[in-house]
A protein has these predicted regions:
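Short, glycine/charged-enriched secondary-structure capping and boundary segments
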Residues: 25-28, 42, 129-133, 149-151, ...
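Glycine-rich active-site loop/strand segments that organize a redox cofactor
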Residues: 15-17, 25, 31, 47-51
C-alpha cells in the first residue's frame, strides 16, 4: 500500500514481541515467490538471502524410498521472515506496536478506510463475523509436534511408519544452511496408544 500511496497512514498492531515466533521454518512455492517478487522486489531480495531451495520431494514409507522431482520450493526461518517484514515496515515509516492487541473492530472501522486482520486459526474477528464471512470451524483430532533440528535435509522429506501403535509420519525440510524443520504427526488414537498423552501436563518453552 505504501508503494502505491506513500502518503497513506498505516498502523500495525502485533500482539507478540518482535522476536516471538511459533514453529521453526516456513515454506514458499515458486508460485508464491513470484507473487511476492511482483508485489515487493525489495522484500523478495531480502528474503532470498536466507532461503534454502530444493526441487525434490522424497517419500520414505517403511524404508521404501521414492523421489518426486520438478517441485520448486524455498524455506526460511520464521524469525528471519519477521525481521525482513519489520525492516520493510521501518523503511516505509510504518509504526508497528508490539505486545499490543489491535483496537476493537468498531473502533478500527470508525477510523480507518481498510482493515486487514491476520489472527490465525483462533481469529476473534472471524468468530465475531462468521455469519458475514460465511466461515465455519471443523476441528480435527490429529496431534503434531513442530520441532527444529541441526540435521540439514537436502529436500522436502516425508517419513511414514506403520508402528505397533499405528501410523506415524514426519515431514521435514531445510530452512537455512544450518537447520531444518521437523514435524511429527499422528492420529489422536495413535498418540494415546504410544503413551504420549502422559506428557500432556508438561510444558516446554519454544525452541527447547
Amino acid at each position: 500500500i505504501k508503494q502505491i500511496d506513500p502518503q497513506a497512514d498505516i498502523t500495525v498492531w502485533e500482539r507478540n514481541a518482535p522476536d516471538d515466533t511459533f514453529g521453526f521454518g516456513v515454506v514458499f512455492s515458486d508460485q508464491t515467490l513470484s507473487g511476492i517478487k511482483a508485489s515487493d522486489q525489495s522484500v523478495f531480495e531480502d528474503m532470498g538471502k536466507s532461503f534454502a531451495y530444493w526441487g525434490d520431494v522424497d517419500v520414505d514409507i517403511d524404508g521404501s524410498n521414492f523421489a518426486i522431482g520438478g517441485n520448486g520450493f524455498a524455506a526460511m526461518s520464521r524469525k528471519e521472515l519477521l525481521h525482513v517484514l519489520q525492516r520493510r515496515a521501518k523503511d516505509h515509516g510504518v509504526p508497528v506496536h508490539f505486545n499490543t492487541e489491535a483496537p476493537p473492530v468498531s473502533e478500527l472501522m470508525a477510523n480507518y478506510d481498510l482493515v486487514l486482520a491476520s489472527e490465525g486459526i483462533n481469529s476473534a474477528i472471524r468468530s465475531e463475523f462468521e455469519s458475514d464471512f460465511g466461515t465455519t470451524v471443523d476441528p480435527r483430532k490429529c496431534k503434531f509436534m513442530w520441532l527444529g533440528t541441526d540435521l540439514v535435509f537436502e529436500a522436502f522429506e516425508f517419513f511414514i511408519r506403520n508402528t505397533e501403535y499405528g501410523v506415524m509420519q514426519v515431514h521435514a525440510y531445510p530452512m537455512d544452511e544450518k537447520s531444518s524443520t521437523f514435524i511429527i504427526e499422528m492420529n489422536e488414537d495413535v498418540w494415546r496408544n504410544a503413551g504420549f498423552d502422559k506428557f500432556e501436563s508438561e510444558s516446554l518453552p519454544p525452541g527447547v
